[in-house]
Amino acid sequence: MRIGNVEIKNNIALAPMAGVTDLPFRLLCKEQGCGLMCTEMVSAKAVLYNNKNTEDLMKTVPGERPLALQLFGSDPDIMADIAKRLSEREFDIIDV
């Protein structure tokens, strides 16, 4: 399966569940055969203001790829700015 230029080895994708899909849980799912990891939902404003808890939600390790991040917010300009910034990090997919 492919999403854009991201190759996913199977059709099993982890949903971005707030309070659930932290790094240890994602690694466990990857170990069990999940093809696409996804972080918890992340607030664009929290990223803008460098919120430490939000940075913790986005922690990752190379072995969990491909990795998607789901970004939410209400201001289109902030969303666009943060999506662009996050695209320069280790995420393969930014879901807005």
Q: Where on the chain are the PLM-derived regions?
A:
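Short beta-strand/loop segments at the ligand-binding rim of alpha/beta enzyme cores
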Residues: 7-12, 65-68
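Glycine-rich, positively charged N-terminal anion/phosphate-binding segment
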Residues: 2, 17-92
